[in-house]
From Swiss-Prot:
Catalyzes the ATP-dependent conversion of 7-carboxy-7-deazaguanine (CDG) to 7-cyano-7-deazaguanine (preQ(0)). GO terms for biological process: queuosine biosynthetic process. Zn(2+) binds at residues 213, 226, 229, 232. Its EC number is 6.3.4.20. The gene is queC. InterPro entries: QueC (IPR018317), Rossmann-like_a/b/a_fold (IPR014729). This is 7-cyano-7-deazaguanine synthase. It comes from Rhodopirellula baltica (strain DSM 10527 / NCIMB 13988 / SH1). It is an enzyme of class 6 (ligase). One of its GO terms (molecular function) is ligase activity, forming carbon-nitrogen bonds. ATP binds at residues 28-38.
Amino acid sequence: MERRLVNSTSQSKTESAQQDAGKAVVLLSGGLDSATCVAIARDQGFEVHAISFRYGQRHDGELDRAAKQASLMGVVSHRVIDIDLAQLGGSALVDSSIAVPKSDHVDKIAGDIPVTYVPARNTIFLSYALAVAETLGSRDIFIGVNALDYSGYPDCRPEFIDAFQTMARLATKAGVEDEHSLTIHTPLLHWTKAEIIQRGIELGVDYSQTLSCYDPQGSSDEMRPCGQCDACLLRAKGFAENEIADPAIG
């Protein structure tokens, strides 16, 4: 599914974008990090083509937020790609029989690989992004992975991103013809959640229209965060450190 969004006001480049940087494919989940990534790509002058995934996630209300962010930020196109990772299982995010870990404080988040890790998810998502980028003639992919807040996820590490970029340059027509043809941008990789939020606010991201929760309650378009999963706790910590209220919680 693809929607082309036309909004001359929201598509205007920010003052800091000095020139048209070309097309960029941005992974947009509907969460806080990916929305910030879209804003950063636009601020750098890229023509943003967003992609989202309906992969059997229990928090599929994030896709409603992704559509809203795509519209608010004036992306040129927004694709929603269907992949049924629930067939494979192995994660609390796609298997309702596995409980999402809950806690009352961010310091209690476990340091090992959590059950919310979806096997090979970022490898799969980036592979689709790579195919879309090559089809569009784009040299740039943005993904909002973060190695500080999500250190337990193996596919959020800089080593993984570097390895995938090397693979992409070997496995594509564009890469064979120009070994430096593709760059995977990870602008949030070494930022704290507070720093991500601060930058997003500077760029005008509407965080009221984002959903970070792994186990939200309610219908898809009205899902409310649980407030106790790892994602909720880290998000709350980020807003608290900025001394502002989370606009998504009212």
